[in-house]
């Protein structure tokens, strides 16, 4: 039976993959986007692109009318420059608007995509059960995503059918290339390395995950998840490695001689914050001070959702093929 799913952030890397997979399995998709003209490939496969702003509750409700459930992908991501008010509007108010629409329109479930930057991953428990850090990073991205996470789970505790998914470092092909290659994306970092333009990058462990896996995991959470739970949508445990190491593996697979060097966040805190932004600096600092609990292949997310991500080599291979088809490398 065909269902109608409301997707926010439909032109973003994850959102576009979610829309594509929902269409491929026979669902109707209503996607809230700022500019429908940006995504002709989504319209071509049958996605109903509805113009609107995630920060406007009336826009969100109008776009969500008739939907049976929602996957909330829209977010403002951390970059070198971060204005708290902008992040509050998108990551907090936007999430509230989607949750309100889900409740008021009687949706069966809302899946909200979150992040892992505020969890204590060295607490000796699985990531799905990890507590929030006593002193989480105070960059605008983390602050606002944590507030949104808390709202989702407060609503779940009050009886709403809502849950969160927590992706790692997302990369891979998309039907909306210019959005998938946004300067703050891991795709852009990988492309820079493949072009020999990324000399070094902050050193911290990266849970590389293909966008198509994040999409399939989010859809599985919609179908098989449990209200109030959270799911860790990352790559395989053996593929966790620094950004430089991930870039270097991409270069090896593509036959590119360039190599990226790891960069210690302590070498120039002020300069590196200006270059990489407060979110990545906070992640690097937290990682250097913590002992992470090793991720197991048998984990709550895999057991509940049947989530089995592809290997980093497979994902990078798909990315390289896509970039070549686009004429980027």
What are the residue ranges of the model-derived segments?
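NAD(P)H-binding glycine-rich loop region in Rossmannoid oxidoreductase-like domains
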Residues: 37-43, 47-93, 101
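N-terminal Rossmann NAD(P)H-binding glycine-rich loop of SDR-like oxidoreductase domains
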Residues: 5-25
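NAD(P)-dependent short-chain dehydrogenase/reductase
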Residues: 161-164, 168-206
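Substrate-positioning beta->alpha
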Residues: 182-185, 200-222, 229
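Mid/C-terminal beta-alpha module of Rossmann-like enzyme folds, strongest
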Residues: 217-283, 312-313, 317-329
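Conserved Rossmann-fold NAD(P)-dependent oxidoreductase catalytic core, especially the SDR/UDP-sugar
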Residues: 93-141, 163
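Active-site Tyr-X1-5-Lys
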Residues: 138-163
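Conserved C-terminal active-site "lid" loop/helix of NAD(P)H-dependent oxidoreductases
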Residues: 211, 270-308
């Amino acid at each position: 039976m065909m269902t109608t799913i409301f997707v926010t952030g439909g032109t973003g890397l994850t959102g576009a993959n979610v829309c594509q997979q929902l269409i491929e399995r026979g669902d109707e998709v209503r996607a809230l986007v700022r500019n429908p003209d940006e995504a002709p490939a989504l319209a071509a496969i049958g996605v109903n692109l509805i113009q609107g702003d995630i920060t406007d509750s009336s826009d969100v409700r109008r776009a969500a009318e008739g939907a049976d459930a929602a996957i909330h992908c829209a977010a403002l991501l951390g970059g070198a420059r971060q204005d708290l008010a902008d992040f509050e509007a998108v990551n907090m108010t936007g999430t509230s608007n989607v949750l309100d629409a889900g409740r008021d329109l009687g949706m069966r479930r809302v899946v909200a995509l979150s992040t892992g930057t505020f969890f204590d991953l060295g607490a000796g428990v699985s990531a799905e059960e990890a507590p929030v850090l006593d002193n989480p990073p105070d960059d605008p991205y983390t602050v606002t995503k944590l507030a949104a996470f808390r709202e989702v789970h407060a609503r779940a505790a009050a009886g709403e059918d809502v849950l969160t998914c927590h992706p790692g470092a997302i990369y891979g092909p998309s039907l909306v290339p210019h959005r998938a290659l946004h300067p703050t994306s891991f795709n852009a970092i990988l492309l820079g390395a493949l072009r020999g333009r990324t000399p070094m990058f902050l050193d911290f462990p990266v849970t590389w995950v293909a966008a198509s896996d994040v999409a399939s995991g989010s859809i599985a959470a919609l179908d098989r998840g449990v209200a109030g739970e959270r799911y860790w949508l990352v790559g395989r445990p053996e593929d966790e490695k620094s950004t430089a190491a991930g870039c270097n593996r991409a270069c090896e697979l593509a036959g590119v001689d360039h190599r990226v060097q790891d960069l210690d966040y302590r070498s120039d805190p002020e300069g590196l914050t200006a270059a990489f932004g407060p979110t990545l600096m906070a992640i690097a600092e937290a990682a250097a001070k913590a002992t992470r609990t090793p991720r197991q292949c048998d984990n709550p997310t895999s057991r509940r959702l049947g989530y089995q991500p592809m290997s980093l080599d497979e994902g990078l291979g798909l990315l390289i093929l896509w970039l070549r088809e686009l004429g980027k490398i």
